[in-house]
Each structure stands twice: as structure tokens, then as C-alpha cells.
Amino acid sequence: MNGYRPSSSQHACQQNPSPDAGTASARLSRRSFLIAGAGALVGAAGRVRADAPIILGQVSLSFYAVAGAVVHEILERMGHTVELRQGPHDEIFPMLGDSAIDLMAACWLPEGHAAYWAKYGGNAMEVARLYDGARFFWAVPDYVPASEVASIADLAKPAVAQRMTKVIQGIGTAAVITTVSQKAVGEYGLDSLGYSLRPGKPAEWTGAYDAAVAEGRWIVFPTWAPQYLNRGGKLRPLQDPRGILGGVNHASLVAPRGRFQALPATTRAVLARIDLGLDGVTEMDWLVNVGKKTPREAARLWMQANDGRVSGWFR
């Protein structure tokens, strides 16, 4: 090997072996056997890990579900079995921290999920940047004049406060948009004017918006991008001069470092290339909430329409 040739003295030892040489040879054979056996065990362990189900965690909101569905589809195309874990933020992030899942879709950084990441992301890593431009904001329906309501601060104007629905419907208490919206109510002095934030289920949140629009009623709507209601241009974002709701984020597919490194190299490489874009997630979210597709169906439709982009992930 590597151009090595035994010397004549070595040949002589091989032709006339001494008892010591025989003992050494036996030791060498035993050592080779052990090394080969260990290699076989490592190979078997690698095959077992490659064949084991991949556990995908995601927050149970539709825009996370469609991003997760694309990851799910990609993994199945590569021959993996996928087990899905869904729940609110305060259930899924601890699973990431405990290495109880292989992947999680998705984490907003650097600000959106900063507190969760600081608490549960110490042994985790960003796998792929799924989309940029993610942000939280408050909005009003487009029929509310911008000349009267352009920023969150304008909600305190007497004429605006008189017309605006005072109950601001939010989503679950563990969601970051709920936390920052509650802070905004206080920071902008809206609580003293009768405004209040009411956490609820996603259906209650969208239901409050739909009911207000149907009645032409003024309403403030805490929301985010990507989200399907942004697709029609019927929501107008409000400025946040105090910066309470935070800045722009990117959303990443994340994973416990050890569990991700245990995945096959090809799988890791393909996952790292996934790029959905803000518009892609918005479109899939619209297919779920308006088109009444399942997240998996929405993911397949979007992937078919963007076949060239998806094929590039497998290059």
C-alpha cells in the first residue's frame, strides 16, 4: 500500500517464523478481527440511524405547518419515514432543547424567538434559512383611512379610540406576537383608553377579523408575515414608532446538533438548501386557509409549481 514494499529481512522472518513471531501474528490477527468487528458495528449503527423515523416538530399554526410540510415531503422523497410532533411554542421549543426531535420548523431569529432560542437552543443549530422578511406587526383593514390611523400611536387619538373596536383579539399566550402585543397595549397607553388584548385560538383570531370586515367595523389586528391574509392586500400595516413589536427576522429550520449530525450526509446537504421565500409560505398558507387544502396538499402544489427551485435542492 502507498508504494510500500517489505525488505528482504522481513521476507526472511515470514519464511522462517519464530515462536515469538507466531504469537505476534496471533495478536495481530486478533486485533484486526476486533477492528473489523468494530467497523461493522459502526456501519450497522449508521444504517439503523438512517432507517429510523425522523421526528419533525412544528408549532401548530398554519404558516409553520406548510413550511414543515415541505420539509416532510423532501424527507419522504429521500426515503425517510417522518413522525410529526405539533404543539404550541411552549411545548415544541422544550422538545428542541431536550433533543426529543430531529428537526423543527421553524425558529425566527435574531429577535422573534430570541427568548426561546436562548433557553432551548444551546445545543441546537440552524440547518436552513427557510425565508427572510419575517416580522410581527399590527394592521387595520384597508378601509380604515391612513390619514387617520397610520401608526399604533394613532389608536390613542380620541376620534380613533371612539370608533375602534377596543378588544384586540390575539392568539395563544405562549406566542411571541401575544407577548409583544400585550406590551404594546401598555407602552402606547392604550390600556388607559379601554383597549385590551384577548388571547385565543387561531380560529377566534381570524374570526374576529372576518366579522369586523363583514360589518365594516374598525379593528386593529395583531399579525405577522408570512400569513395568508397578507396575500390579498386587504391589511394595512401600522407603523410602530416605539419599536415594541421588534424588527425583521429570518426563519430557520433548526435541529439539535447531535441528532442532525447523525442523519445521512446527503439528507443533511439537501435540507440545508431548502429556501421557501416569504411569498412561498404566504401562498401555501393561503391554499390551506382559503383553498381548504391540507398542509401536505398545499406543499405538493407549491412544489409542483416551483419544480425547478425544488430540484435545485437535490443537486
Model-based region annotation:
Residues 1-28, 35-43:
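N-terminal secretory signal peptides
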Residues 101-105, 173-243:
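Ligand-binding pocket segment of bilobal, Venus flytrap-like solute-binding proteins
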Residues 136-146, 249-263:
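A bilobed periplasmic-binding-protein/Venus flytrap-type ligand-binding module shared by bacterial periplasmic
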Residues 123-172:
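A conserved helix-loop-strand patch within extracytoplasmic ligand-binding domains
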Residues 278, 283-288, 295-315:
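C-terminal functional modules
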Residues 51-63, 80-85, 165-169, 271:
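Short, well-ordered beta-strand elements
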Residues 68, 87-123, 208, 227-234:
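Pocket-flanking alpha-helical
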Residues 61-62, 83-95, 196-208:
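Short helix-initiation/N-cap motifs at beta->coil->alpha
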